[in-house]
Amino acid sequence: MNHTITIAGDDWYELISLGDGISLIRERYVADWLRCNIWHIQGKHQDLLIDSGLGLRPLKPEIARLSSRPVIAVMSHCHFDHIGSCHEFDRRLGHRACSEVYQDP
């Protein structure tokens, strides 16, 4: 018997614009103590994504709503709550000590 669990739909992510092309993205239904801040910074030719959350819902479509530029995903460290969606992005950067995790999350 298969059971399907639905994790919140289109409102999983909360997008907060801070102005000047900087947005805070939060996983709305994740407890504060477990949720990391996901930052999207718009650039002239490409954008930066700082951390990627737990990865319980796809993040890349949310980023596409903010910008059509290529994204460089930068992970501050390799804890699961910061790298969950990094696999969705072609360019992933982070500390050398975690390079294997970023290459194959």
Please provide the spans of the model-predicted regions.
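Metallo-beta-lactamase
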Residues: 2-20, 96-105
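Short gly/ser/thr-rich secondary-structure transition/capping motifs
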Residues: 5-7, 32, 75
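Conserved beta-strand hairpin/beta-sheet module of binuclear metal-dependent hydrolase folds
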Residues: 11-65
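Active-site HxH/HxHxD metal-binding segment of metal-dependent hydrolases
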Residues: 56-105
